[in-house]
C-alpha cells in the first residue's frame, strides 16, 4: 500500500491544502512534518470555507487520523483555538482522531517577540517573516535550549526551563530595542494550562506511526510552505527555517525513508511569492495585478498581497529534482482563462548569458531576467469541467507543454476553490 508525500513545488501557497483534503479520502492518516502556523490552508467544501494553520487539512474527514510530527514547531495557543473552532462545527467529534508528537518544539511568547523585533530592526533587509516565532523556535531547537510539548506536561520542568531561558530572551529583546511584557509566573501558568489541554493528544508519534504501518494503514504526508523556501534548497536567506522538501517528511515524524512510495508536487498554473527574495518571472504590471485579483492572491495567514508572475519552468524542474517528484498537481488553471496569451519562463538571462537551469547562487537569481515562451490563451471558463477531454484544446496544450519542460507528468488539475472542482488524472495512492 503506497504512502504519499505532498509538497509545495514553488514558493508556498500552491493549494496543497485542497489537494491533501482531496487525497485524504484514500489515506488513513495525514501527517504534518515541518513548519508551524506560518502556513495557512484554505479549504472550501460545499461552499463552506475553513482556514487551518496548524492542524492537518485531513481533519475535515470523519474517521481519519491526523498527526503533528516532531518536525513541526507548535504554538499551543493556535492549536487550542483550532480545536475549539473545529469542535464548534462538529468537525472533531473524536479526540483520538488527532495526535501530536511529544517531541515537537513549542513556540513560546519570547519567540514571537524576538521574531517581530528582529524583522523591524532589519529595515529594508526584511525577509518577510510572518512574525509568529517560527524561526526563533527552530533556532532554539538547534541550539538545544528549546522547550518541547513534553515539557508543558510537567509543571516543575516547565517552570525550570522558562526560568533558564527567559533572561537571555529578555536580554536579546533589550538589544533590539523591544520591551514586551514577559512575566515569568504568567507564562508558566498559561503554558501549564495549555499543556493540560494538549495532553490528551500528545503521544510518541514515531511509535504510533510505526504501528499504523504495521497494521496496513496508508499515510499521507502534508508539507507546508514550498520547495523554494527550504532552508537548504531554497533562495537562501529568503527562506523559512525548516526543510520543506520531501526528504524531510520522514525525519519530521520519526520514520525511515522506505516509508515513502510517491511524491506529489503542487504547483499553480502561474506562480506567486510572499515576502522578499529573487523571483525572475514576477510581473509588476497590470497583468500581475490581474492575476492577483482573479486568483485572490492574498496570504491565508498574513493577508498580505502575494507577488505574482508567470509559471517558472526552471524553478519547477528544480523542485522536481530536489523532491524526486513522481507527479504534479496543477492548481488554479481556471485563473488563466481569458488571457489572450499565457507565458512560461523557459530560461534566465543573466549578465548577457541565457541559462536553461536554475542557478544555485541566489545572487545570480536576483539579477536574472526571465526568458519566456508564449502560448495562445483560452477564453472558456473551466470551473464546471470535470474531465481532461472537456478542457479547451489550448488549456490542454498548456498543461502538456509544462509536462515537457519539467519532465514530470501532471496527474491532477484544480479548476476552482471547491473540493469538487478537481480533475484527478492519476491517483497517487493507486500509481
Swiss-Prot record:
Binding residues for GTP: 12-18, 40-42, 306, 332-334, 414-416
Pathway listed: Purine metabolism; AMP biosynthesis via de novo pathway; AMP from IMP: step 1/2
Catalytic activity: IMP + L-aspartate + GTP = N(6)-(1,2-dicarboxyethyl)-AMP + GDP + phosphate + 2 H(+)
InterPro entries in alphabetical order: Adenylosuccin_syn_GTP-bd (IPR018220), Adenylosuccin_syn_Lys_AS (IPR033128), Adenylosuccinate_synth_dom1 (IPR042109), Adenylosuccinate_synth_dom2 (IPR042110), Adenylosuccinate_synth_dom3 (IPR042111), Adenylosuccinate_synthetase (IPR001114), P-loop_NTPase (IPR027417)
Presence of keyword Ribosomal protein: no
Binding-site residues for Mg(2+), renumbered to this chain: 13, 40
Needed co-factor(s): Mg(2+)
Protein name, per record: Adenylosuccinate synthetase
Organism: Anaeromyxobacter sp. (strain Fw109-5)
Amino acid at each position: 500500500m503506497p504512502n504519499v508525500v505532498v509538497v509545495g513545488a514553488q514558493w508556498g501557497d500552491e493549494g496543497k491544502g485542497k489537494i491533501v483534503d482531496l487525497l485524504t479520502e484514500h489515506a488513513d492518516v495525514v501527517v504534518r512534518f515541518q513548519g508551524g502556523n506560518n502556513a495557512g490552508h484554505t479549504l472550501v467544501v460545499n461552499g463552506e470555507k475553513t482556514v487551518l494553520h496548524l492542524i492537518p487539512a485531513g481533519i475535515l474527514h470523519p474517521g481519519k487520523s491526523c498527526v503533528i510530527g516532531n518536525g513541526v514547531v507548535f504554538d499551543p495557543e493556535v492549536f487550542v483555538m483550532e480545536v475549539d473552532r473545529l469542535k464548534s462545527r462538529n468537525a472533531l467529534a473524536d479526540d483520538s482522531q488527532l495526535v501530536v508528537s511529544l517531541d515537537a518544539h513549542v513556540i513560546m511568547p519570547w519567540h514571537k517577540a524576538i521574531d517581530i523585533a528582529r524583522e523591524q530592526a532589519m529595515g529594508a533587509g526584511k525577509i518577510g517573516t510572518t512574525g509568529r516565532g517560527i524561526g526563533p523556535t527552530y533556532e532554539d531547537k538547534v541550539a538545544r535550549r528549546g522547550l518541547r510539548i513534553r515539557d508543558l506536561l510537567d509543571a516543575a520542568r516547565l517552570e525550570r526551563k522558562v526560568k533558564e531561558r527567559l533572561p537571555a530572551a529578555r536580554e536579546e529583546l533589550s538589544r533590539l530595542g523591544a520591551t514586551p511584557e514577559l512575566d515569568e509566573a504568567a507564562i508558566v501558568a498559561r503554558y501549564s494550562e495549555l499543556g493540560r489541554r494538549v495532553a490528551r493528544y500528545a503521544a510518541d508519534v514515531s511509535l504510533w506511526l510505526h504501528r499504523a504501518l504495521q497494521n496496513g494503514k496508508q499515510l499521507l504526508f502534508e508539507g507546508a510552505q514550498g520547495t523554494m523556501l527550504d532552508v537548504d534548497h531554497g533562495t537562501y536567506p529568503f527562506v523559512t527555517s525548516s526543510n520543506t522538501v520531501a526528504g524531510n517528511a520522514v525525519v519530521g515524524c520519526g520514520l525511515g525513508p522506505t516509508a515513502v512510495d510517491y511524491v506529489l508536487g503542487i504547483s499553480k498554473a502561474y506562480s506567486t511569492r510572499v515576502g522578499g527574495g529573487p523571483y525572475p518571472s514576477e510581473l509588476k504590471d497590470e497583468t500581475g495585478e490581474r492575476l492577483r485579483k482573479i486568483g485572490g492572491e492574498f496570504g491565508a495567514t498574513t493577508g498580505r498581497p502575494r507577488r505574482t508572475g508567470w509559471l517558472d519552468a526552471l524553478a519547477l524542474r528544480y523542485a522536481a529534482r530536489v523532491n524526486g517528484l513522481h507527479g504534479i498537481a496543477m492548481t488554479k488553471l481556471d485563473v488563466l482563462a481569458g488571457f489572450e496569451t499565457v507565458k512560461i519562463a523557459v530560461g534566465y538571462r543573466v549578465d548577457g548569458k541565457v541559462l536553461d537551469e536554475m542557478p544555485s547562487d541566489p545572487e545570480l537569481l536576483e539579477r536574472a531576467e526571465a526568458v519566456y515562451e508564449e502560448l495562445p490563451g483560452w477564453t472558456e471558463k473551466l470551473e464546471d469541467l470535470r474531465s481532461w477531454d472537456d478542457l479547451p484544446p489550448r488549456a490542454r496544450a498548456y498543461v502538456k507543454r509544462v509536462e515537457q519542460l519539467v519532465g514530470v507528468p501532471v496527474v491532477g488539475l484544480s479548476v476552482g476553490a471547491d473540493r469538487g472542482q478537481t480533475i484527478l488524472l492519476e491517483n497517487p495512492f493507486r500509481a
